[in-house]
């Protein structure tokens, strides 16, 4: 619950290894900080949530430039505007990082619910960080429930899906 009007509510700090120096402020958030998903030094997706007003906000953080810019905001209760979660892959250190396409200017988003006026139709989309537009590139058919379980190759869009129908059990 946010009771006072202030310029920011949370500050995200970092300290460099071997963790003996002073912490450095990365950015401040207007509402409550919820999560950060890292890509590289120029891309991290920062999530802010304000539960009392049912608001959800995603921004892109560029650690190299020190900038935080809003990508989109939506209502937490509006499933139709939920873009899903960024697809991740393991980097050379074995850590999950955001999978990018189009020379790092777009992010793959996986919506395993895919609320639509025709029911739940999960989808995979490409979110363009420059134009702030989302393009659905794969969607479950209406006669089944199928979602992307894993993206094996983001560049060539090789993926594994889990599929089931009223008469067929899930394929794995």
Question: Language-model segments: what does each one mean?
Answer:
Residues 1-172:
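Peripheral, non-catalytic segments that deliver or gate enzyme domains
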């Amino acid at each position: 619950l946010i009771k006072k009007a202030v310029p920011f509510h949370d500050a995200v700090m970092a300290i460099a290894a071997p963790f003996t120096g002073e912490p450095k402020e990365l950015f401040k958030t207007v509402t409550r900080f919820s999560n950060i998903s890292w890509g590289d030094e120029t891309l991290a997706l920062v999530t802010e949530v304000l539960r009392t007003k049912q608001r959800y906000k995603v921004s892109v953080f560029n650690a190299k430039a020190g900038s935080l810019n809003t990508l989109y905001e939506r209502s937490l209760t509006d499933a139709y505007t939920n873009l899903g979660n960024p697809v991740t892959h393991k980097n050379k250190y074995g850590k999950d990082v955001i999978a990018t396409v189009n020379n790092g200017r777009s992010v793959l988003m996986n919506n395993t619910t895919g609320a639509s006026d025709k029911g739940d139709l999960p989808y995979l989309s490409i979110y363009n960080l420059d134009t702030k537009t989302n393009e659905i590139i794969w969607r479950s058919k209406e006669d089944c429930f199928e979602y992307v379980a894993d993206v094996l190759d983001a560049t060539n869009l090789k993926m594994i899906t889990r599929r089931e129908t009223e008469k067929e059990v899930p394929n794995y």
